[in-house]
Regions:
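ATP-binding glycine-rich phosphate-binding loop
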Residues: 5-48
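ATP-binding glycine-rich loop module of kinase domains
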Residues: 30, 38-94
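Activation-loop N-terminal segment of eukaryotic-like protein kinases
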Residues: 171-177, 182, 188
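C-lobe/activation-segment region of protein kinase-like
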Residues: 184-223
């Protein structure tokens, strides 16, 4: 991993990652798995055996017109102008071990930034629920989210996610094991809950213009 992300290589991931074709053969490259207003998300393998995946997001630098288009609130416009995607990476990096994806690297390149992170092979909670999981599995997933938020609060009392909904919780299959929580034990039922998307989060000593300036109150988000 360190060799892959070293130096200029990190600015051209598609030339160094591996992609498995439908016929099973391997080639250099990555596949796009998502796209937002300011960036595209890709997945690739770090070895030619495709035993481990990595995800990276290429973030273009938006122009002023792109940032402020259809945004009538002056304060919200200013916040978007100041917002740095690296802030979200930094928050997630500090929360490693608390049920969030592992962050690998934030690389500033020519005309774009690239964020490398762990690939979470799972489904959004709202989609996972459509497959009618068992009552034990549903209880376990909810407990995992609550437990990890509790653990985060113990270490970082000032943390607030501010945007924790069914689309920002991923559920992935894992080996069955027991979870101990405040004197109680419950099975994970073969699933792990992963909290994502910290773009609206508040974190001690990390400035988030969307939250620190109270602009979230104007866009339907409350503490």
């Amino acid at each position: 991993m360190k060799k892959l992300l070293r130096g200029k290589k990190a600015c051209d991931p598609a030339s160094h990652l591996w992609l498995k074709k439908k016929n099973g053969t391997m080639t250099r490259g990555a596949v796009k798995i998502g796209e937002g207003q300011y960036g595209k998300v890709y997945r690739g393998c770090i070895d030619d055996g495709c035993e481990k995946y990595i995800v990276y997001k290429e973030i273009k630098t938006p122009s002023l017109s792109e940032k402020t288009n259809n945004l009538p609130l002056a304060g919200f416009k200013k916040a978007l102008e100041e917002m740095n995607p690296k802030m979200e990476f930094t928050i997630a990096k500090k929360l490693e071990g608390f049920g969030v994806p592992k962050m690998y690297l934030y690389k500033t390149c020519d005309k774009k930034d690239i964020l490398y992170s762990e690939y979470v092979k799972g489904k959004e909670l709202r989609e996972w629920m459509r497959f009618q999981p068992t009552l034990l599995a549903m209880k376990s997933v909810m407990l995992q989210v609550i437990y990890n938020l509790y653990r985060i609060q113990k270490k970082y009392p000032g943390f607030r996610h501010h945007d924790l909904h069914l689309g920002n919780i991923l559920v992935r299959p894992v080996p069955v094991k027991d979870i101990k929580f405040m004197g109680h034990t419950i099975s994970n039922a073969g699933f792990e809950a992963v909290i994502i998307d910290f773009g609206f989060s508040a974190f001690p000593r990390i400035k988030n213009p969307l939250i620190n300036a109270n602009n979230y109150k104007n866009i339907g988000i409350s503490r």
